[in-house]
Amino acid sequence: MPATLDPEGTAGAERGASAASDRAPRPPEPGLARCAGTCHALFVFDIGYEVDLEAARQRLSAFGHGRRFRHRSATHTASQEQSFPLVFEQSVGAEGLAEVLPLPFVRPLPEVLISVYPSGALSVAWRLPFERSFEELIALSSALYDDQSLERVSRRIAAEVQQSLGDSVERPRLAQDFEDYFAFHLPEPPRGWQPAAEALWASSGARGGQERALARLLRAERSELSEQEVSDALSQSISYAPGEVVFVDWSAALLLGADVADELFVLELATVELLELRVLDGKLYRGIEEAYEILSRRGHFLRNLAPLGGDLARIARIQADQALLHEGVDNPLKLFGDDYLARLYRAAQERFHFGEWDAAIERKLETLDSIHQKLSDLASTRRSEILEWIIILLIAFEIVMSLAEKLA
């Protein structure tokens, strides 16, 4: 006989399964998920034209050491490694920590990591350990974005290091311009989140709560973001191994993985390059103003006939200095023998708009060259005018002498 169905038994089994499902622990909301890690707050300053790292190393011999890529397969020549910074730790001290305004949920470690670059850049890296909910981490990101106390203390540390380096810094000057960047490192995904990195950076489909929370962290935004803003915030992501991913945005990054020392180094190098591009752009702007002032300068007759050799030499020096700086700005970033690190750098390059900065600098260099050429033409014209006046005076002198002889 065919087996008879037992509706009551089936319904009971379904009710039992439903009850068991209700009793099973549900994953927390993305914002409530707990996470532990470290926020690396980076501040980069320009302390001079360039730094002699060998001389700086001798001055800091007690605690300075070089910095290298540690775990990836990047290979470098000896000449390339000269572009790597000199790194050392320095205690902030109780007074320095007291100057830092209270940040939500974290307290900085009392030591900062300082890196001195041959290009004249100096970075101060703070480490802020945390173990909080992701929503609280977003609040920390927003507070760091608005905070000025860390930058103020970092600038004072940079000035002290600049003084300690002495004559190893050529043309020392602590510029007002600076760059900051915040990298949030999570050794493991927040509890209850999907562990696979690929699930976090899918580029299509509706964005879920995890993606929205990530975007708010990167944009330091307490309120909800639009779908378009979320997609843009997560558009630059790099993954090396299952369970590892790096999201790169213009002011912050999220690094998911156990060991991210190399990734942090690449992001620091990119931030250093961004500052150098900004400083170079400012120097070129001031150089153009100075050159234009020389070109448009007017005075009395004799002043207009004065030679322009000194002015031409000054503009030529500005051109040479800035062209050399522009050529050397990205030297530390031409060192990647590892494709993964190169891809990470390209993601940062895209986020920081290096292409636009390079184009603006090239235009300013061309403008400076154009002014130099016009000034050179003006100098040639003045030389011709001076020669003409000399000839006129000689002719007049001959006429006067002839008349004087006849009258005598």
Which residues does each PLM region occupy?
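Short Lys/Arg-enriched alpha/beta "domain-start" segment
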Residues: P2-E244
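Short, surface-exposed, polar/charged, turn-prone segments marking secondary-structure boundaries
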Residues: H71-S73, E151-R155, L275-E276, G282-Y285, ...
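Short charge-dense sequence patches
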Residues: S226-P242, F265-L277, G310-L324
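Switch/coupling subdomain of P-loop NTPase systems
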Residues: L255-E289
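Membrane-associated alpha-helical segments
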Residues: V279-E405
